[in-house]
Amino acid sequence: MSKGVIIIGLGQIGMGYDLHLDPALHVYSHARAFSQHPEFHLLAAVDLDGHSRNIFIQTYQAPAYSNLDAALSQHQPDVVVIATPTQFHSEILYEILENIRPMVILCEKPLSYILDDARKMVQKCRDKGVLLCVNYMRRSDPGAIEVKGMIDSGMIQTPVKGVSWYSKGLIHNGSHFFNLLEFWLGSMKSSDLIERGRKWGEDDYEPDVRVKFERGTVIFLAAWEENFSHYAVELLSTSGRIRYEQEGSMIQWQHIEDNSVF
């Protein structure tokens, strides 16, 4: 039996990114992903904006509500997606847990801009027996999993040295690559601030930092999103070089070999 899903927040990641794209080729939003997966079905959505609600109703033939209480009084979801701006995550999570006990809460990243708040959210879900997942999806990509296998097998020898480019805030966007590198290289052991960088929005910064993981050291550098987008990771090993570019759509491994001339 398929699992019922409620989506809270019908912005870009909730519904908008792929709204006008071919559904056979493009799946970038929670709404489309859950609607197409055979093991899930959309129960409802929640958003303050009436226009967004109407689009959801017309596109997915499911109801949409202006407030969470109304949705939870009518539906008992197995999965609740929190796809609102970060500052509302904790408030919404607590309201969910006060009313129902879903199997899973899938929250957009970052969980919170405040570490203590994030820890409280995690503990609250543990206390209620609810699985809390944060949408750091890059480590689930087949290419990223293959890279991890290459590192685990020793094909990519460690320790590595690397650079990761990010923009739009270290917490908001850079954390995607921090999470990916934790997946590849193990837990963070230490970090050093190179340059504080500028403030991004109300709650984030774009520092340059050096992070030491269990299997190597990576320098995170902030790019300039207002001029162009650039998200990439390059790792050097004694056995070669791995490049992760275009947000993971291109991954290139170059192994070492003897040069017959030099």
Which ranges hold each PLM region?
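Rossmann-like dinucleotide-binding domain that binds NAD(P)(H)
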Residues: 158-234, 247-248
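Beta-strand-loop-alpha-helix segment that lines the small-molecule cofactor/substrate pocket
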Residues: 78-79, 85-86, 90-139
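Short acidic-hydrophobic, aromatic-tinged amphipathic segments that line or gate anion-handling sites
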Residues: 63-68
